[in-house]
Amino acid sequence: MKLLVKTLAGLEGVLADELQQLGAQNIEPLKRAVSCEGDLALLYRANLWLRCGIRILVPVFDFQVESEEELYQQLRTIDWSKYLQLHQTFAIDANSQSSRFRHNRFLAQKTKDAIVDWFREQHGRRPSVNPKSPDIRFHLHIDSRHQASFLLDSSGDGLHRRGYRTTGGAAPLNEVLAAGMIRLAGWKGDQPFVDMLCGSGTLLIEAAMITGNIPPGLLRSFAFQNWQNFDADLWHGIKSEARQSKRPPQQPIIGVDNHFKAIRIAENNIAAAKLQSYIRVKRSTFQQFLPPEGPGTLISNPPYDLRLETRDINGLYKEIGDRLKKEFTGYQAWLLSGNLEALKNVGLRPSRRIHLLNGQIACKFHKYELYSGSKKKGKEGVDEKARNRPRLGRGSRPA
């Protein structure tokens, strides 16, 4: 079985690594996607376990098409009862790169017409359309050479919908992007993890699921459960195996935010994900926060001043850089920002720059190596002001 796994720009490599770990074959990174091959068990495991995939599509058939009418007639020849039953709802997502098919909505409508007309002809009745929450979702793609590909969506809701988000806050980070950032940073749970601008807690939760070996899809359902070839015994066995793979916390995962509402949302999301034993959150400014001793990993997504109002965005980034230099000795710090001018005010030279997209915003994901030599020391090599101050660690209680 061939699979096409969609992802975000910049995450193709880490997604390919995930698929390899799951046992996929013939893995090929593409633009915002990775293709591979595997059996039904791989399809189920991939939906359950992938952290950096958005949705998993199964190619069904393809054909050359020259016009809308030819598309309709070709689709009328398909036995749609193999994929859809009369009592089920369905939806069509259409996308075209062909100069002959410029209107995606019209393509979706034409495809829908062909399907319902086939059912009327064969059964005298037709299934209903549900664009928001269908039982079966089809994808039609027409490339620049007018090759039409028809695919079944095995995921249903996008895989970023983990099932733990109670509410997102002002500008929530996409779960797939958050997991991808952690994968790109190379954090594996063997060091403290800190987000000093944690917002609704997405990075913290994704980090906890990684270190706890908890599948991100454990709290939700999938479209393949509505397919006619759904193997309930196989699926229940895979879920049972996944539940038994959970690991206890290894290192502290700590989030800080100065906004009371953000901390409450983060606490609710953490509770919904059942990860209270993995994560500590604290209401504090990042200027006052003291992390566990390094080595450690910090990943934060500071405001861009594009959707969130800040009084002085350049000053904010300078303060972030100052705090990193002062208190995060031995850490690898990663910052994602869509404000490239403000990012320059961090005042540190990035050792790595990765281009990512946060929604429609072009961002850079910068890595900063915070060596001990960059920190002002006293006679014994210790920051004199921080010598006697307590640091938030695994045993600390959240505020």
Model-derived segments and their meaning:
Residues 139, 363-367:
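Conserved hydrophobic/aromatic beta-strand scaffold that supports enzyme active sites
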Residues 173-291, 306, 314-316:
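Conserved S-adenosyl-L-methionine
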